[in-house]
Amino acid sequence: MSRVCEICGKGTVKANRITRRGKAKKEGGVGKHITKTSRRRQKPNLVKVKAIVDGRPKRIKVCTKCLKSGRVERAY
């Protein structure tokens, strides 16, 4: 099963997790320094929804942004 919205195509994105050390400048230190970056994945907020597709009810994966904006016609 893919983690992709079937309406807008939003999927997983690669991002960095940044590890810092040191004391912040506003707290009287010399500033934060990056010691390590590691890759991580940001996943979309998907919901399985029964929606009307081509006039028939079908269960699809939709991101919550499409659901809130009204791009999906729900079938109850």
From Swiss-Prot:
**Family matches, as InterPro entries:** Bacterial_rp_bL28, Ribosomal_bL28, Ribosomal_bL28/bL31-like_sf, Ribosomal_bL28_bact-type, Ribosomal_bL28_sf
**A Gene Ontology molecular-function term?**
structural constituent of ribosome
* UniProt biased composition (Basic residues): 33-42
Q: Does the keyword Repressor apply?
A: no
SUPFAM superfamilies linked: L28p-like
Q: Which UniProt keywords apply?
A: Ribonucleoprotein, Ribosomal protein
Task: Spell out the Gene3D superfamilies in the cross-references.
Answer: Ribosomal protein L28/L24
Q: Which Gene Ontology biological process is one annotated for this entry?
A: translation
Q: Report residue spans for region: Disordered.
A: 21-42
Tell me which GO cellular component terms the UniProt record holds.
ribonucleoprotein complex; ribosome
**Keyword set includes Transport:** no
Q: Which family does it belong to?
A: Belongs to the bacterial ribosomal protein bL28 family.
- Name by which UniProt lists this protein: Large ribosomal subunit protein bL28
